[in-house]
Every structure is written in structure tokens, then in C-alpha cells.
């Protein structure tokens, strides 16, 4: 036995020799006071205090009270305008990534262009649709192109602009982020300066899609870029510098071509944000599927000015 340690004593077992089903225990003082208070309450009254919410009349004993309906939320109507939508997820067990540039018209109609990857297939197609107001600051959206119809719901900010949306068709798990898009024309000069990004994508290898992730730091000037990418492919980490070019149309649709220091070539379709806050791109190489928002430093400075 170690010096200074107390002698171990087994726990004392309570004496149950005289215990019967009729044995009575004294009620705690708090319970006695509660019962006394309830005895003098008028019918239908609720006891105020830290015991919780009032149980509605007719509630079954032992069940949790039913919450009262919340006060109706005052919401702005869905706001017409031009938007860019970046979506990523799975549809019918295939990875899906897309960028939409669309206009919400005042009559509730939608017109736009869809850049989309579905597995190893890329397509670019115009579409039309409708949007409508839903309760609790939401919008219902339906879009149709030459091959399919999709539906989704978006949550709206205080000004009625969609911020995030979710696909609502069966076997579709796709979430999207929205960006306001000015109606002004775009040019490559909007990207001049520093652009940072982080992305998660997928690579086709050995007959299956495997996850990857990358962070990037780019410097743009007059449509040309120099950058560094740090990538994770699971078993390995890769660092490479790269260079490339972007060709931008007045409609803000763009094409990006890049080559890195390891010899790999990358191809993207993109949408430049007309306010100069960056660009979104979608990879078109069949064995690599990445969609991402590449944020210009000026967007960060607008959100949180440097000291």
C-alpha cells in the first residue's frame, strides 16, 4: 500500500430488507410549494416562472406543449435583376456543377444561359423559366431548356435578392450560391490585381470520382494571369505555379486557359462579375470537375476595409 493513501472501503450497499411497494418518501419542499400554488390557480391559468412555456388547453398530460405560430415575417418581394448562380452537388448519382447567368424580369419570367458539367459531359445551353414569391422570404424557381426542367427554392435577403438555393427534384442534391450581376458590359481589365480562391472538386481516376481541394493566389494584368496553386488529392499534396489567359465577352461570359509548371493544361468556362469582385469558373476537362468563385481583393476590402 502506498503511504498516505486512505484505506479502500467498498461502497455501502443500502438496506433493502424492509422495502415494500407501499413505502412512502417525503415530498421535496419545492414540490409541496408548487402543488399548493396550483391548488389556488383559477381554471385555465398558467403558472409563470422558470418552468417553461404554457401548455395549451386540451394538451394531453405528459406531452410537450405545441409551439404557437410565429408572428408572420415581413418579406420583400423577389427582386427582378441579373444574377449569377454557382451550384454544386449530385444528380441521379452523378456529380453536377454549374454556373448560370440569368435575368429575372418584372413579369416573373427568367431568361439565361447555363454552363454545366454532369459527370464527364460539359454542355452550354440557353433556358427560360419562371420565379414566384413563396412564404417566409422564399422564391420558387422553375427553369427549362431543350432537354430538361429543373425546380428549386431560394431564400431571399431583406431586399428580395436570392442568396442561396436548393434543388427540389427527387434524386437531386444541389445547393447554389447567388451573386448580383450588374447589367454593364465586362472586360478582362476588371480582374487586374490580386485574386484568391479555395475550391473543392473531383478527379476521375480508376473508374471513380475522387475528391480534391485547392487554394490559389493569382495576379492578373490585361487578361493574363500568373499564380500558384496548392492542391490536395488525398494521398498527395501538390504545389505548382501556373500562367494563363482569359478572353471575356461583353456579356461577361469568358474562356480561361492555363498551364502549370508540371505541364498540366486546364480549361474553363467562366463568368466575370461586372462589379469587379472576381469571377466564377467551371472546368471543362472531362476528368476534372471543379466549380469555384475566385474573389478579387477589392471585394474583400469592400466587405472589411483594411486598417
Task: Annotate each PLM feature.
Residues 1-26:
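N-terminal secretory signal peptides that target proteins for export/translocation
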Residues 20-28, 67, 302-304:
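General helical structural elements
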Residues 30-42:
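Bacterial N-terminal signal peptides
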Residues 44-47:
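Sec/Tat signal peptide C-region and signal peptidase I cleavage site
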Residues 49-307:
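Mature soluble binding/inhibitory domains
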Amino acid at each position: 500500500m502506498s503511504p498516505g493513501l486512505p484505506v479502500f472501503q467498498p461502497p455501502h450497499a443500502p438496506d433493502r430488507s424492509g422495502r415494500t411497494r407501499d413505502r412512502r418518501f417525503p415530498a421535496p419542499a419545492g414540490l409541496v410549494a408548487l402543488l399548493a400554488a396550483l391548488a389556488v390557480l383559477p381554471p385555465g391559468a398558467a403558472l409563470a416562472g422558470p418552468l417553461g412555456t404554457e401548455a395549451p388547453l386540451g394538451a394531453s398530460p405528459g406531452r410537450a406543449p405545441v409551439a404557437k405560430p410565429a408572428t408572420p415575417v415581413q418579406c420583400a418581394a423577389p427582386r427582378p435583376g441579373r444574377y449569377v448562380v454557382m451550384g454544386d452537388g449530385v444528380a441521379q448519382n452523378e456529380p453536377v456543377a454549374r454556373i448560370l447567368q440569368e435575368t429575372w424580369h418584372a413579369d416573373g419570367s427568367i431568361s439565361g444561359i447555363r454552363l454545366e458539367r454532369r459527370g464527364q459531359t460539359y454542355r452550354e445551353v440557353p433556358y427560360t423559366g419562371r420565379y414566384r414569391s413563396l412564404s417566409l422570404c422564399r422564391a420558387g424557381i422553375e427553369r427549362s431548356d431543350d432537354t430538361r426542367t429543373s425546380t428549386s427554392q431560394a431564400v431571399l435577403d431583406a431586399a428580395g435578392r436570392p442568396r442561396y438555393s436548393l434543388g427540389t427534384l427527387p434524386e437531386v442534391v444541389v445547393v447554389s450560391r447567388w451573386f448580383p450581376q450588374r447589367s454593364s458590359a465586362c472586360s478582362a481589365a476588371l480582374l487586374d490585381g490580386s485574386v484568391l480562391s479555395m475550391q473543392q472538386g473531383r478527379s476521375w481516376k480508376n473508374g471513380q470520382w475522387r475528391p480534391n481541394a485547392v487554394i490559389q493566389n493569382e495576379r492578373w494584368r490585361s487578361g493574363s494571369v500568373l499564380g500558384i496553386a496548392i492542391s490536395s488529392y488525398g494521398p498527395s499534396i501538390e504545389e505548382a505555379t501556373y500562367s494563363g489567359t482569359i478572353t471575356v465577352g461583353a456579356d461577361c461570359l469568358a474562356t480561361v486557359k492555363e498551364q502549370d509548371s508540371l505541364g498540366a493544361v486546364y480549361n474553363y468556362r467562366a463568368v466575370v462579375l461586372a462589379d469587379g469582385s472576381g469571377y466564377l469558373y467551371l472546368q471543362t476537362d472531362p476528368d476534372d470537375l471543379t466549380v469555384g468563385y475566385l474573389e478579387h481583393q477589392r471585394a474583400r476590402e469592400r466587405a472589411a476595409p483594411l486598417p
